[in-house]
């Protein structure tokens, strides 16, 4: 068969890119130099960033940097092998012990990222003949892990406990095992799952529950713990990596069966050491941990929005083009607030996702609120 130029790889990519461009959905990487105190530089412009998940500003904390530097000098830049070979460094083992204690669990397992953790957990626990029930607004990696498991996967309406009960009643009887997937804090809406009700249903229907705590660790009251508590090291802890906290038998099983752990290089020792020191700070400086939520609530009160439930506040715009235009207008005023568009959020719900940090001050929060009142009065109302 002779080559068809119109069917080339580049032609395919160009056609798809043109479609994304036409619908204002093309993504581009923008070089951003983050600094301390919520500072960022992009395109030669100094900005105040409200688009970072470093909720406590610990990525630039001198104590965290010192811990990483010491581990870097002692253990080298990388782990050098998978954890089951020689990549299980002393900082990793120490971090797992501390994470388990923080979560009130017997053991913990650190992965290369939160995404990798969720790719590995569900397939290690359930498979064909089993059932997964997942909140429709769960993170992409929860859905990816569910798909890889080959279990029957059913979405339930966001935070809808009544529908979850209906689906459990309908499907649980024919499934060997059932796993419920949700988030403590939802990453694009900033709201929280009704965990007491979900955990009660899980008990009633003999189901297991995994809670993704990527955006909640250290910055919201955890409330009731789930049997499976996963999260990241890259947000509140200012480092990089993911983890699962659970019982010792569950962690032992995943050590053998989670493919995203077994077949990848271990986390760099410096990342583990940084996260370990950051966790110490979270536990010993509660006033710092409380600040992001307090600032988020100051912001929502100023704009007359529903009271923030977490450090994440969505400002709903609607059309992707309008969200991009508002983001650009804010950048011209010195604020970095990135537009979130489909498929990350549903069509027609493009937004600015405003993330608050202990590194922000009240003046910066108030200035952003005033800019939004002026630029997008239809999306906010002054309180």
From Swiss-Prot:
Cofactor(s) needed for function: pyridoxal 5'-phosphate
N6-(pyridoxal phosphate)lysine: residues bearing it: 235
Pathway annotation from the record: Cofactor biosynthesis; biotin biosynthesis
Top EC category: transferase
Molecular function as annotated in GO: 8-amino-7-oxononanoate synthase activity; pyridoxal phosphate binding
Pfam families noted in UniProt: Aminotran_1_2
A GO biological-process term: biotin biosynthetic process
Keywords, sorted A to Z: Acyltransferase, Biotin biosynthesis, Pyridoxal phosphate, Transferase
Catalytic activity field: 6-carboxyhexanoyl-[ACP] + L-alanine + H(+) = (8S)-8-amino-7-oxononanoate + holo-[ACP] + CO2
Binding site for substrate: 27, 34, 139, 344
Entry EC number(s): 2.3.1.47
Binding site for pyridoxal 5'-phosphate: 114-115, 187, 212-215, 232-235
Known function: Catalyzes the decarboxylative condensation of pimeloyl-[acyl-carrier protein] and L-alanine to produce 8-amino-7-oxononanoate (AON), [acyl-carrier protein], and carbon dioxide.
Family recorded in the similarity comment: Belongs to the class-II pyridoxal-phosphate-dependent aminotransferase family. BioF subfamily.
Subunit relationships: Homodimer.
Stated name of the protein: 8-amino-7-oxononanoate synthase
Organism: Methylorubrum extorquens (strain PA1) (Methylobacterium extorquens)
Organism phylogeny: Bacteria, Pseudomonadati, Pseudomonadota, Alphaproteobacteria, Hyphomicrobiales
């Amino acid at each position: 068969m002779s080559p068809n130029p119109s069917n080339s790889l580049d032609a395919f990519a160009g056609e798809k890119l043109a479609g994304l461009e036409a619908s204002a959905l093309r993504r581009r990487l923008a070089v951003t130099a983050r600094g301390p105190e919520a500072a960022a530089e992009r395109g030669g412009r100094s900005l105040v960033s409200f688009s970072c998940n470093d909720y406590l500003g610990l990525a630039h904390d001198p104590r965290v940097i010192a811990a990483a530097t010491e581990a870097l000098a002692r253990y080298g830049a990388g782990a050098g092998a998978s954890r089951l070979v020689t990549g299980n460094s002393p900082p990793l083992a120490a971090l797992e012990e501390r994470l388990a204690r923080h979560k009130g669990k017997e053991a913990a397992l650190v992965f290369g990222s939160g995404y990798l953790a969720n790719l590995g957990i569900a397939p290690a626990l359930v498979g064909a003949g089993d059932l997964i029930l997942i909140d429709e607004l769960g993170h992409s990696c929860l859905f990816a892990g569910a798909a890889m498991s080959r279990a029957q996967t059913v979405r339930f309406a966001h935070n809808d406990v009544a529908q979850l009960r209906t689906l459990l009643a309908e499907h649980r009887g024919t499934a060997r095992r059932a796993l419920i997937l949700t988030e403590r804090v939802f990453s694009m809406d900033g709201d929280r799952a009704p965990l007491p009700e979900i955990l009660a249903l899980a008990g009633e229907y003999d189901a297991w529950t995994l809670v993704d705590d990527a955006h909640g660790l250290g910055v919201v009251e955890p409330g009731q713990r789930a049997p499976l508590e996963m999260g990241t090291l890259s947000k509140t802890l200012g480092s990089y990596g993911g983890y699962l906290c659970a019982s010792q038998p569950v962690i032992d099983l995943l050590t053998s069966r989670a493919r995203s752990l077994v077949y990848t290089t271990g986390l760099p020792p410096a990342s583990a050491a940084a996260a370990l020191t950051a966790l110490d700070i979270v536990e010993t400086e509660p006033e710092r941990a409380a600040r992001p939520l307090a600032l988020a609530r100051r912001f929502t009160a100023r704009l007359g929005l529903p009271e923030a439930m977490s450090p994440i506040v969505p400002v709903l715009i609607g059309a992707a083009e309008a969200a991009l235009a508002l983001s650009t207008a804010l950048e011209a005023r010195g604020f970095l607030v990135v537009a979130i568009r489909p498929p990350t959020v549903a069509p027609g719900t493009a937004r600015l996702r405003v993330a608050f940090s202990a590194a922000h001050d009240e003046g910066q929060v108030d200035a952003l609120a005033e800019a939004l009142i002026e630029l997008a009065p239809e999306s906010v109302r002054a309180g």
